């Protein structure tokens, strides 16, 4: 007798989990497979199979800035100001330069590696996890575009500069003799140092790299951190005027890192490349971060600007809140098809809010 057709019906019946009981378990008891299985009174293997089938999904919840009513109202107005209501699309954002600071660390406390079967596991040590070597950088980027006058692509990576100082070693050590220049990171950035960085680094870089920089008003968007200067800062405006630049300093809404392309994704891309290096001192760390900044393709930056436009759309639909999922529009697929837009079209749902 041929029983091959009955093969799928053999073995014990599958044990399913009542999915309605999953949501009844408090979230703080659903942090691991072990605790979730214990709360549901099921074996871990049964729960794991449900996760593998997609019946239960894992989720990583990250803290987001708390927003007041005024914060949310400011976010809505800021996002609406980037929409061309007549054409029903977002502005191209070609006249905006985003600036922001970020700490870059020598290494992460926890790193993941893929090892061979017999390979020895790496052993990493540090004197203190709290005081890891780090350097703060200021980055300035804009929307990539084709430079018609130079007939080439302008990547719009204005620059990346470390907040550091060079001191002379006062005494000898096993690493260097007395009198050797030693690079040290600035522990905290003040408004004086921030202003100097804008005047002596950012503005000259804009004048050098930006095509037809004197023919348009360039907005420099910053967040509301305490060391940042006021939009009407006379020293900055005077320095821009001497360079022949028409610069306007603008502030993004408070508690809104998601409205800056650097915080939205570009810093993470730099950091991912930087951690592929293995710096052993501050000079090597600075070089690794600067090399990562230069290696990133301009298309990555352009994609983050398109994501920013979708984030602004979500922000308005959420009435200024930040309880949304970062939308995906298959940018790489659209690019391969030659259909990647310069600006995102306003959805019908968003038009009703304008």
Which residues make up each language-model segment?
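C-terminal anion-handling pockets and recognition modules
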Residues: 92-93, 262-354
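Acidic/histidine-rich, metal-coordinating catalytic segments
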Residues: 99-101, 211-229, 252-260
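Extended, low-complexity cationic-aromatic segments
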Residues: 72-204
